[in-house]
Amino acid sequence: MNAHAQACAVTSAASPDGVLRERGQREVFCGLTGIVWLHRKIQDAFFLVVGSRTCAHLIQSAAGVMIFAEPRFATAIMEERDLAGLVDANDELDRIVTQLLARRPEIKLLFLVGSCPSEVIKLDLSRAALRLSQRFSPGVRVLNYSGSGIETTFTQGEDACLASLVPVLPAADRSARPSLLVVGALADVVEDQFKRTFAALGIDQVAFLPPRRSSELPAIGPETRVLLAQPFLGDTARALEERGCRRIAAPFPLGGEGTALWLAAAADAFGVSHAHVERTIAPLKARAERALARYRAQLAGKRVFLFPDSQIEIPLARFLSREIGMELVEVGTPYLHRDHLASELALLPGGTQLSEGQDVERQLDRCRDARPDLVVCGLGLANPLEAEGLTTKWSIELIFTPIQGFEQAGDLAELFARPLLRQTRLAV
């Protein structure tokens, strides 16, 4: 975990649109955390972090891999002699990669992942990736991205990873039919559900990024319509648009309402009638509504404060307010991408207090003053707030857990009900 303190004066000011912009001390996980879910998604990929022992401990602890399993990630640990320039770090990296690929011949895609230490000594991993890719081609493709915690939040690791894939995606034929590309790592079960729903809607040219295997990289071009499944993929979306793809504006598929609007936006882009969309999703939407009903009784009227951490805070706030009936005290987000979140912002209750960026001490003061029923925050804040008598929900759990789609709407609501139920039981 990185605690950033800025030497400049702390700033906290409301913008003309009412968003509180904060530029002060921050507490965040670094982008290396994304490896925890990405290494499970791309089955023939391997993530080699070029970093310190601290980086290695973070990934191993967060992933919770069983000791007899062979994970698809590792850390090339930079020692003092590397940092001091006593050895050629590139030679050492080449040696480690050669050993790794000899031992793990099933690897077809290797990511060299930068960290704070590798960036501090200016180790050029992009040149290393090009050199190693040429050396091990065509059997292995080597790419690189930064998972550094310098000026980032932890979900940017996935954004950087997917953005690194965009330049190597094959170009679609000029005669290719319009296709849909769903962007953002989803659990396999969620991906399969969406595939079935898109097929039922009549959208059969559907691909997902990241794919399950590197051999399944989707072809893209001007006829590719991009549908974001996660709200933190700004760099990836920009890279896809630069290659001619067109993004579909939509809310994100959290809860029954969000999923319905997300699917409807895709259907509209492919000329599917509104009536057919309603007929197709009605049973799924009704099932989500039934699953949410039990949790709405527990959560309606409860006050929630969301600290900026994961970049999914605004879609979560929309879900909690509109589908669960919770009262939004403050909704913080590390970065506010107004274009990608326009549909979500329009659905928030009028007067919702939004904050962008972080000044953790000021936000803690506001949270303490408000005494909300539930606080959604990072791991570093959860235990101290619990000690002060506040009930918390770890925001990182909302990234690790499958929460997208109709079938997972009840599971998403349960994640917020569980800490309140725990608090009730402990109070007895």
UniProtKB/Swiss-Prot annotation:
Q: What does the record give as cofactor?
A: [4Fe-4S] cluster
Q: Which GO terms describe its molecular function?
A: 4 iron, 4 sulfur cluster binding; ATP binding; metal ion binding; oxidoreductase activity, acting on iron-sulfur proteins as donors; oxidoreductase activity, acting on the CH-CH group of donors, iron-sulfur protein as acceptor
Name its species.
Bradyrhizobium sp. (strain BTAi1 / ATCC BAA-1182)
- How is the quaternary structure described? Protochlorophyllide reductase is composed of three subunits; BchL, BchN and BchB. Forms a heterotetramer of two BchB and two BchN subunits.
Q: Which UniProt keywords apply?
A: 4Fe-4S, ATP-binding, Bacteriochlorophyll biosynthesis, Chlorophyll biosynthesis, Iron, Iron-sulfur, Metal-binding, Nucleotide-binding, Oxidoreductase, Photosynthesis
- Name the reaction it catalyses: chlorophyllide a + oxidized 2[4Fe-4S]-[ferredoxin] + 2 ADP + 2 phosphate = protochlorophyllide a + reduced 2[4Fe-4S]-[ferredoxin] + 2 ATP + 2 H2O
Q: Tell me how the cofactor is bound.
A: Binds 1 [4Fe-4S] cluster per heterodimer. The cluster is bound at the heterodimer interface by residues from both subunits.
Is-annotated flag, keyword Transit peptide?
Answer: no
Q: Which pathway does the database say it acts in?
A: Porphyrin-containing compound metabolism; bacteriochlorophyll biosynthesis (light-independent)
What name is this protein filed under? Light-independent protochlorophyllide reductase subunit N
What does this gene product do? Component of the dark-operative protochlorophyllide reductase (DPOR) that uses Mg-ATP and reduced ferredoxin to reduce ring D of protochlorophyllide (Pchlide) to form chlorophyllide a (Chlide). This reaction is light-independent. The NB-protein (BchN-BchB) is the catalytic component of the complex.
A Pfam match is Oxidored_nitro
| Its EC number(s) | 1.3.7.7
